[in-house]
A protein has these predicted regions:
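C-terminal catalytic/motor cores of large multi-domain enzyme assemblies
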Residues: 1-220
Length: 220
């Protein structure tokens, strides 16, 4: 195996061996978020336009502020909740393998600043030019496979983190509200979390907070 593949194999085997995962998922109406993105991008130049991934990252960070026990590390038999929200952003490498460098202080940055940071981070990750802090500081990882057509993804927690959030493709789906059925753009959000650190009701609160923040993208 290539060195990166060996490192991934060791980390994932350790995760499944040591971490009792629990899994939750929910469907989230993205109509408000996509409408806000469209309006926002009309005011921006082509190089400054925002992608849905940025809104999903920012909403995840805000939800972690609401439910902080998913934001941290399991070390020496106890949960250490992090003071900052540094989200690992999973990036597939062109030669194979995966990295999830940290985007720092996601909850305090604007969507525009986050988009600029991703434009810088992704090519550096693929060129092998990441800083050590970007490789070690993540407090939770986000994986998004929507651009590959996947509808949902359940990730494997990267130790010592205690959760990973996954997003699938945004799809038009039937949606019932107030007795009426229509079609909405919907994303499936999933959570894999460490049962030593939290229980299912904490995970459910997080997914509910995530959905609420995505209904009010102008506040992100």
């Amino acid at each position: 195996l290539a060195p990166m593949r060996r490192a991934i194999a060791a980390a994932m085997a350790r995760s499944k061996r040591e971490i009792p995962h629990y899994y939750l998922q929910t469907r989230i109406d993205m109509r408000a978020a996509l409408a806000w993105l469209q309006a926002e991008n009309q005011r921006r130049s082509l190089t400054e336009r925002l992608l849905p991934a940025v809104v999903l990252l920012k909403a995840t960070a805000r939800a972690l502020r609401d439910v902080p026990s998913l934001n941290g590390h399991w070390i020496d038999g106890s949960l250490h909740v992090a003071e900052q929200v540094h989200l690992g952003f999973a990036i597939a490498l062109k030669g194979g393998g995966l990295l999830a460098p940290a985007v720092h202080d996601v909850d305090t940055k604007s969507c525009g600043a986050l988009m600029a940071e991703l434009h810088d981070l992704i090519p550096r990750a693929r060129a092998g030019r990441l800083r050590s802090s970007e490789m070690t500081d993540a407090t939770l990882t986000v994986t998004n496979l929507g651009d590959l057509g996947v509808e949902s993804v359940f990730g494997v927690i990267y130790p010592p983190q205690v959760a990973i959030v996954g997003f699938g493709r945004i799809l038009d789906q039937p949606w019932a509200e107030q007795g009426m059925v229509g079609v909405r753009p919907v994303v499936t959000a999933s959570l894999a979390a460490d049962h030593r650190a939290t229980d299912g009701h904490i995970g459910a609160r997080f997914l509910d907070a995530l959905s609420r923040h995505l209904q009010h993208p102008e506040q992100l």
